[in-house]
C-alpha cells in the first residue's frame, strides 16, 4: 500500500505537469502563426556601382522552447518552432535612356562694314560687325523636343559656350599745350591732340605727334629732328649738327649751307633739291615730277615714279632725286648731301651749319626750335604740336590718335561663362572675370567659352591741358559658338576640349566698304548605348562676299581658315577642335524582384581652363595651309573587244528531247587577230558565252575547231 502511494504521487505530479504543459502548449499548436515573430526590415544603402539601389532585408525570428519533466530520469523535450531568414542579394539596376542620332545645323551670318577716312585732318575708322540670330534656339529645338520621358529627365549639355568679343576704341582729339623751363624732363602724353613744348636747354626737345603740324629749327651744334606725318613741317639749322625734318604727304623744302647733308624726305609731294657742295643732294619722292641736273664729277641719279622732281648739284657728288607723289625742295651749299624725301606733306628745312638738316614729315604740321647743342626732335602724328627747348633736359610730348593709324593701348575684360542645360532650361554660371591690359594694333581676344570685350581708352591727360574733344570710334565685334556634344543621365565620363586661339592682323588701310560672311557649323552626334565612345563630327562651311574694290581670297578648311585681302589687311585664324565623349552603360544583373529607385549620379569632368589669347598684328601675315585631298578613283579598262562579224548558219537540226540537246554552230569571223592562237580563241569564246548567257542562262558553249578561211 505504501508502494502504491509511492508510485501514485509521482504519477499524480507527472500528470499535473503534463496538464499544465498541455494547457500552455495547446494554443501554440492551434495557432502557430500568432506566436511567430516576423521582422521586416528595409535598409536603404548606397552602392559603389554607378547607380542608386535599395537593399531590402527580411528576417524571420527563430523561437525555441524547451520543456522537460523527469519522472524517473531526465526526459528532455525540445521544440524548435522555426527559423527562417531571407537575405536577398544586392542588386543594382541602372536605366539609361539614349536619345536617337541627331544633327544640328548652326548657321551664323556675320555682316561687316568698314569705312576709313580722315575728314579735316581728324582720322576716323569705323568697323562694325553684325552677327545673326542666336544659334542656341536651334540646339534647344533639336534636343528638348524629342524625348521627355521619365528616364531622360536629366539632360546635361556639357559645353554650350558663346565667345563674344568686341573691341571698341574711342579717341578724343583735343588741343593741349604744355611748357617747361625746368632742367628736368616734362612728359605730356596726349592722344589726337595739339601740343606744344618749348625748351631752351642743351638737351633734346622731343615732341612726337601724328597727323599734326610741326616745325623745327636749330641753331645749336646738335640735330633738330622734326618727323611728322600728313603735315606741314619746316626745319632750319644754323649749327654744326643736323636738322632732321622728315615729312610724308606734305611739301618739303630743305636748304643747307654747311658741310653736312640737308635731308628732307617727302612722299606724295613735289620735290626739288640743289647742292653746291661736294656731297650729294638726294631728293627722293614718288608719284611726282622729277628732274635732276649735275655739274659735278659724280653721277646724277633721278629715279621717279609718276612724279615731278627737280634737283641741281654743283658739287663733285651725285644729286639723287627719287620722288613719290610729292613736292619737295632742298638746297645745299655745304660739302655734304642734301636729301629731301617727302611723302604727301609740306615740309621745309634749312641748315647753315656743318651737319645735315633732315625734315621728314607725315600728314602733319609740326614746329620745334632749339637753341642748345642737343637735338630737338619733333615727330608728330594726327595732332598739332610745337616744341621748343631752352633747358638742359628733354621735353617730351608724345601724342597718339587712333584715327590715322590704329595703335591702341587696350584693356581687355575677360569673363568665362559656362552655360549648363538641365531639363531644357538654361543655367548660366559666371565663373571668372579678369582684366588684362595690353597694347596691340588690333586687340581681339576670342577664346572658347570666353566673353571678352576690349576697350581702348586714351591715357589720362595732365591737369594743364585744355581739351577740345572730337570723337573717333573703332568698333569690332565677333561672336563664336562652339557646341561640342551632349551627354545624358547615365554618362559618367564626358571630357570635351575645344581650344580656339585666333590670330588676327588688321592694317589701317581698308578699301572694302562692306563684307558679308555666312558661316555655319554642322554638328553630327551619334549615340549608341552599346558602344563606349560616340562619334562627333563637325563641319564648318564658310562663305565670304566682299563688296568694294578690295579683292579677297578665301581658303577654308576644317581646322584652318585664311583670309587674305589685297587692300593691305590680312587675317588668319587657327581654330582646331578636339572632342572626346565617353559613355558607359552598366550591365543589368537581376536577382530577385526588387524595385530599384532613385536618381543616378553622373560624373563629369570640369571644363578645361582656356587661357586668354591676345592677337598678334602684323602686316603681310604669311600663313601656310597644307590641304591634302585624296581621291580614290578606280579606272576600269574595259576588255578589249575584237570587232567581229559573225554569221550563224545552222548546219544540223537536232530535235531536243526531254533532257535537252546540243546545237552545232559554224561561225565565220572577220578579225584582225589570229584566231588560231588559243588565247585569242579563248577570249572570243568567253565573249560569246557572255552574250549567250544574257539570253539563255543554261547554255554551254564549247569550241570544236578553228580553221583559217
UniProtKB/Swiss-Prot annotation:
Tissue specificity comment: Highly expressed in kidney, moderately in placenta, lung, prostate, liver, and digestive system. In the kidney, localized in the proximal tubules but not in the glomerulus or distal tubules. Detected in most of the male urogenital tract epithelia, with the exception of epididymis.
Query: Which Pfam family is one of those matched by this entry?
Result: MUC20
Where does this polypeptide localize? Secreted; Apical cell membrane; Basolateral cell membrane; Cell projection, Microvillus membrane
Residue ranges under compositional bias (Low complexity)?
173-182, 190-199, 209-218, 228-237, 247-256, 266-275, 285-294, 304-313, 323-332, 342-351, 361-370, 380-389, 613-652
Q: What is its main location?
A: secreted
The segments labelled Disordered in the record are 57-92, 170-403, 434-515, 583-657
Q: Name one GO cellular component term.
A: plasma membrane
* UniProt sequence repeat ranges: 173-192, 193-211, 212-230, 231-249, 250-268, 269-287, 288-306, 307-325, 326-344, 345-363, 364-382, 383-400
Q: A single GO molecular function, which one?
A: identical protein binding
Gene Ontology biological process terms, A to Z: hepatocyte growth factor receptor signaling pathway
- Keywords, alphabetical: Cell membrane, Cell projection, Glycoprotein, Membrane, Repeat, Secreted, Signal
Keyword Nucleus set for record: no
Q: Where is the composition biased (Polar residues)?
A: 57-69, 474-489
Which intervals carry biased composition (Basic and acidic residues)? 78-92
Q: Where is the signal peptide?
A: 1-25
Q: Where is this region: Involved in oligomerization?
A: 450-656
Q: Where is this region: Interaction with MET?
A: 657-709
- Glycosylation site list: 423, 616, 622
Q: Where is this region: 12 X 20 AA approximate tandem repeats of S-S-E-S-S-A-S-S-D-S-P-H-P-V-I-T-P-S-R-A?
A: 173-400
Instruction: List the InterPro entries hit by this protein, alphabetically.
Output: MUC-20_rpt, MUC20
Q: How does it assemble?
A: Interacts with MET; oligomerization increases affinity for MET.
Q: Which PANTHER family match?
A: MUCIN-20 (PTHR37358:SF1)
Q: What does this protein do?
A: May regulate MET signaling cascade. Seems to decrease hepatocyte growth factor (HGF)-induced transient MAPK activation. Blocks GRB2 recruitment to MET thus suppressing the GRB2-RAS pathway. Inhibits HGF-induced proliferation of MMP1 and MMP9 expression.
**Know the name of this protein?**
Mucin-20
